[in-house]
Regions:
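S/T-rich, low-complexity, solvent-exposed segments of bacterial secretion/appendage proteins
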Residues: 1-627
Length: 627
């Protein structure tokens, strides 16, 4: 009798727990991070009997989460990838919008180069209106460059702020996980704290949105949380917080530090923080450098050609553009007093990379920031040359000192127009040649080029004479012989910063006079040469024009944006699949729960009937005994 009553009561209690659990599942069906709960029951062990064993009811062993650690980890991983893809795509989209909104640089460059053609074709040599318009076009080009440069600088600052705020959010989440670890550990003695476990999983999922993480379940019920690169973030109730600090070379650049102060910027991957750091290094830095490379190519090539011509005042042309010097940033850990001054000396050899210059105690070496070695040569004055740069080191360096060389980073935002006087446009060729009237040979000047506009004797008259058909002499106006020797057809002759090539065959006694251009007002040769720079390869070893370099930049950014959008689509799909797989195990199915509700309601009613039957039998027994 007692066994029947006890069995019924156990069934009633088990059904009650099951009904409460089903009700909790139903009410939390829309709760983010909730894991469906299930009741685990076990048959009570009946006491031993000499003849046979009768069941002794049921016990509720536990109320557990329907949970798969594998599927949950897959959700965290896919969430980190999706968050990274979302942030990366947002940044790339913003960059594309910047390029579109800040003006048409290619159009401005086309107009600028075209303005030299207009100057060359001007009907009145002394008319400065075409020259004034050219300077206006130069200002427009510089303005578009500086606007673009400022926009990119602004995004660098925005990313710095986002990195700082993200690290703060990460630290708050780490503290909360550590706190829940402690609560879960303290609660295990009184049952499994499912709600706390769900909250902790939700926090890890939130953390995975900031950076890639893994969580290891320990035997004491706590999580040990690590970054995807193995950096410990949470152990038990202790959180190893991250922090931000200045880049060792650039104090305006924010890097990520671990709890001991070590720089882990390059080790962060996944999540929004990984996207910020990855985008900054691989897209934004590259865009700034490529834009700066174009600005340097423009200013250097135009200024060089301008310096090879004569302006309306009969003077060699002065620079049209001005550029900031390349940056040479010392490491914060440098122990010596050395400083480095960088200068672009070969624009064709100039790349869009940044470099690290290191001193080992006896010699300097240079690599790209990606670690590729760069050949350096030591000049007679002690300066170093490599990658199109000349690096002048002053002061005393100590072993281990280093510098970050950024040849192009600030060039676009610092480009200005330095020429303001339209008469200063050097449209005329600096030199002219004249064959002696008594020449009898077929020789004629086919090319006369300025090779060194800084040569102080450039405009000094020189006579090129051929004593015999196979020899030549170069003599200045004072009678000084500047050069002589054997002559072969097509040979290039050079003096005073110019070079000359003849076609045909000069005869013995022939001569040619090289002098400053006395007809500069009516000459447009240098203006045409300046206009021709639009299609001249001045960058990448002479293979790319300035316009082509900018086109390459827009193509690279466009490709980065397209890849980011494609990756976002892919990661969205993969995260959806991971969520579906996880929810198939842990999610609440209302149809299933409704069926369980009926099932356990019937079990409750049946157990109540068992109790009622036991009571009825017991009452009948009492009545029989009392008769």
């Amino acid at each position: 009798m007692a066994n029947l009553l006890s069995t019924g009561i156990s069934g009633l209690n088990a059904a009650q727990v099951a009904l409460n659990t089903v009700g909790n599942n139903i009410t939390n069906a829309g709760t983010d991070g909730y894991s469906r709960e299930v009741v685990r029951q076990a048959e009570r062990v009946a006491p031993p009997s000499n003849r046979f064993t009768v069941g002794n009811g049921v016990d509720v062993v536990a109320v557990e989460r329907a949970y798969s650690s594998y599927l949950t980890s897959a959700v965290w991983s896919s969430n980190a990838n999706l968050s990274r893809a979302t942030t990366y795509n947002d940044l790339a989209t913003t960059l594309n919008s910047m390029l579109s909104a800040s003006g048409d640089l290619q159009g401005a460059l086309d107009n600028f180069y075209g303005a030299f053609d207009t100057v060359a074709n001007a009907s009145a040599a002394g008319d400065t209106s075409a020259r004034q318009a050219l300077l206006g076009n130069a200002s427009t080009v510089a303005s578009v460059f500086t606007t673009l440069g400022a926009q990119l600088d602004s995004q660098q600052k925005q990313i710095n702020g986002q990195i700082t705020n993200t690290v703060k959010s990460i630290n708050t989440t780490l503290d909360n996980i550590a706190s829940l670890n402690r609560k879960i550990h303290d609660s295990l003695g009184s049952g499994t704290p499912n709600a706390l476990l769900d909250q902790r999983d939700a926090l890890v999922n939130s953390l995975s949105g900031y950076l890639g993480v893994t969580a290891v379940s320990e035997t004491d019920g706590t999580y040990s949380v690590y970054s995807s690169s193995g950096q410990s973030l949470v152990s038990g109730s202790h959180a190893f917080k991250l922090s931000t600090g200045s880049d060792p070379y650039d104090t305006a650049r924010v890097n990520v530090l671990d709890s001991s102060g070590g720089d882990i910027t390059s080790r962060i991957s996944g999540g929004s923080l990984g996207a910020l750091l990855d985008y900054r290094s691989n897209v934004l830095d590259s865009a700034q450098n490529r834009l700066g490379q174009a600005a340097i190519g423009l200013a250097t090539s135009v200024n060089a050609q301008q310096g090879k011509g004569l302006d309306l005042n009969g003077q060699l042309g002065k620079p049209i553009f001005a550029l900031p010097a390349p940056q040479a940033l010392p490491a914060s850990s440098n122990g010596g007093t050395a400083t480095v001054a960088a200068q672009v000396t070969d624009v064709a050899a100039l790349d869009s990379a940044d470099y690290t210059l290191r001193y080992d105690g006896s010699a300097w070496s240079m690599t790209t920031t990606g670690g590729q070695p760069v050949a350096l040569t030591t000049n007679p004055d002690g300066s170093l040359s490599g990658a199109g740069l000349t690096l002048a080191v002053s002061g005393a360096a100590q072993a281990g000192d280093s510098f970050r060389i950024q040849p192009t980073r600030s060039a676009a935002s610092g480009l200005t127009v330095s020429l303001t006087d339209p008469s200063g446009i050097a449209a005329a060729a600096a030199l002219q040649s004249k064959a002696a009237s008594a020449n009898t040979g077929s020789g004629a000047v086919s090319s006369l080029q300025v090779t060194d506009a800084s040569n102080p004797a450039l405009l000094t008259g020189v006579t090129v004479a051929f004593p015999t058909a196979g020899t030549y002499t170069l003599t200045d106006a004072g009678g000084t012989v500047l050069g002589s020797g054997a002559y072969t057809a097509g040979q290039t002759l050079s003096a005073n910063g110019w070079s000359l090539t003849l076609s045909g065959a000069p005869a013995a006694g022939d001569s040619f006079a090289i002098s400053a251009n006395s007809n500069g007002l009516n000459d447009n040769a240098n203006a045409l040469a300046l206009a021709g720079l639009a299609d001249t390869g001045v960058l990448a070893g002479g293979s790319r024009s300035v316009i082509e370099n900018y086109t390459l930049l827009t193509t690279e950014i466009g490709n980065a944006g397209a890849q980011a959008a494609s990756n976002l689509t892919t990661q969205t799909s993969l995260h959806g699949q991971a969520m579906s797989a996880q929810q198939a195990v842990s999610g609440v199915n209302l149809d299933e729960e409704a069926a369980n509700l009926v099932k356990y309601q019937q079990a409750y009613q049946a157990s109540a009937q068992v109790i009622s039957t036991a009571q009825s039998i017991f009452s009948s027994l009492l009545a029989a005994v009392q008769r």
